[in-house]
Amino acid sequence: MIHKLTSEERKTRLEGLPHWTAVPGRDAIQRSLRFADFNEAFGFMTRIAIKAQEMNHHPEWFNVYNRVDITLSTHDAHGLTERDIALAQFIDHVCAHTEPAA
């Protein structure tokens, strides 16, 4: 079984993810990104999808043109786990090298 983060673990782990916010009413985190255009957004999503498949941990996301909204939570644990933290860290790493639009 996958270990759901305790309140203290969650607080500590989220300190290292300043671009992510808690989802109201859910044990989940989210981040919104904007890119130069649809191709940039879709390319970003493709990179994340490949990693998510390797991890067997898939984000909830929404895309319209240059915008990508990502929500992370582990369904099997009914909340936030280390898998979500690891995927969020990977997403942040990709963003740091992709330069999303302001």
UniProtKB/Swiss-Prot annotation:
Disulfide bonds: none annotated. GO terms for biological process: tetrahydrobiopterin biosynthetic process. CDD domains: PCD_DCoH_subfamily_b. It comes from the Bacteria. It is an enzyme of class 4 (lyase). It catalyses: (4aS,6R)-4a-hydroxy-L-erythro-5,6,7,8-tetrahydrobiopterin = (6R)-L-erythro-6,7-dihydrobiopterin + H2O. GO terms for molecular function: 4-alpha-hydroxytetrahydrobiopterin dehydratase activity. The keyword Lyase applies. Keywords: Lyase. Signal peptide: none annotated. It holds the Pfam family Pterin_4a. Its EC number is 4.2.1.96. The keyword Lyase applies. PANTHER family: PTERIN-4-ALPHA-CARBINOLAMINE DEHYDRATASE (PTHR12599:SF0). Belongs to the pterin-4-alpha-carbinolamine dehydratase family. This is Putative pterin-4-alpha-carbinolamine dehydratase.
